[in-house]
């Protein structure tokens, strides 16, 4: 009954006007969105994650684009996840890092790291934005909403090399955004942050780890296909069916894997 009520509610949510897509600038994108109140239960949050929604600030959203279904919701079934040999090597390589999971806490050190990360990794996209504009976006997107939110930090000798914001639902953790120091490429900090969060979610007894949107063939989003075993939400409106990646490839062969 509650699931049906939530689904009926989701069906009434507004859809934004079209704007340029952040992944494919030549395309137009739209989102279906819900500006939720300050408090939202973990069970309701879980329903939204299962329905393909993500969070920015106090906005839950999912893509709702006309003629494009390339943004695929991607999650790891944790009872099936076992670190591969390469993942174990990554754990060993970064065994000197201190890993902490706690309530999100914005500091000057993290703001400086965020700016360095943005200017290094997304130079062409943020070239016209001032430091103040970037920081205002970060504060609202990542640190404004702390209810059901978790922050992971990776530190070396007291220096923060990486932080990741996660959402804490009833059956899963969902990755919101990660920021890492570009001066340590050999450590693969982005991958290590994901791996550490997945293992933490397993320790908590969670069922899933949501990795956000997977865009097959996209230079910045294609990497998620290497996190397996995984499930993809079928790109069918209002049908919350998740299928294994192998089955998805067979059923939707038009996606360039």
UniProtKB/Swiss-Prot annotation:
Keywords: Acyltransferase, Cytoplasm, Transferase
Listed Pfam families: ATE_C, ATE_N
Entry GO CC: cytoplasm
EC number: 2.3.2.29
Molecular function as annotated in GO: arginyl-tRNA--protein transferase activity; leucyl-tRNA--protein transferase activity
Keyword field contains rRNA processing: no
UniProt record, GO biological process: proteasomal protein catabolic process; ubiquitin-dependent protein catabolic process via the N-end rule pathway
Catalysed reaction equations from the record: N-terminal L-glutamyl-[protein] + L-leucyl-tRNA(Leu) = N-terminal L-leucyl-L-glutamyl-[protein] + tRNA(Leu) + H(+); N-terminal L-aspartyl-[protein] + L-leucyl-tRNA(Leu) = N-terminal L-leucyl-L-aspartyl-[protein] + tRNA(Leu) + H(+)
Subcellular location: Cytoplasm
Free-text function comment from the UniProt entry: Functions in the N-end rule pathway of protein degradation where it conjugates Leu from its aminoacyl-tRNA to the N-termini of proteins containing an N-terminal aspartate or glutamate.
UniProt record similarity statement: Belongs to the R-transferase family. Bpt subfamily.
NCBIfam families recorded: PRK01305.2-3 (NF002346)
Protein name: Aspartate/glutamate leucyltransferase
Species of provenance: Leptospira interrogans serogroup Icterohaemorrhagiae serovar Lai (strain 56601)
């Amino acid at each position: 009954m509650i699931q049906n009520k939530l689904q009926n509610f989701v069906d009434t949510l507004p859809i934004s006007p079209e704007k340029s897509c952040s992944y494919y600038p030549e395309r137009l994108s739209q989102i279906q969105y819900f500006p939720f109140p300050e408090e939202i239960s973990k069970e309701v949050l879980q329903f939204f994650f299962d329905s393909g929604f993500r969070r920015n600030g106090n906005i839950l959203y999912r893509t709702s684009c006309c003629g494009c279904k390339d943004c695929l919701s991607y999650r790891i079934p944790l009872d099936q996840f076992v670190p591969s040999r390469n993942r174990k090597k990554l754990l060993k390589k970064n065994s000197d890092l201190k890993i902490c999971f706690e309530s999100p806490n914005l500091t000057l050190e993290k703001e400086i790291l965020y700016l360095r990360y943005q200017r290094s990794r997304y130079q062409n996209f943020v070239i016209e934005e001032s430091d103040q504009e970037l920081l205002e976006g970060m504060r609202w997107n990542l640190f404004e909403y702390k209810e059901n939110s978790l922050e992971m930090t990776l530190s070396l000798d007291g220096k923060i090399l990486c932080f990741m914001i996660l959402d804490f639902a009833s059956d899963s953790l969902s990755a919101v955004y990660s920021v890492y120091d570009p001066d340590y490429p050999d450590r693969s900090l982005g991958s290590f942050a994901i791996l550490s969060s997945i293992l933490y979610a397993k320790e908590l007894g969670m069922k899933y780890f949501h990795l956000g949107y997977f865009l097959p063939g996209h230079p910045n989003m294609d990497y998620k296909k290497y996190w397996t075993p995984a499930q993809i939400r079928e790109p069918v409106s209002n049908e919350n069916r998740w299928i294994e990646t192998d089955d998805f490839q067979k059923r939707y062969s038009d996606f360039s894997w």
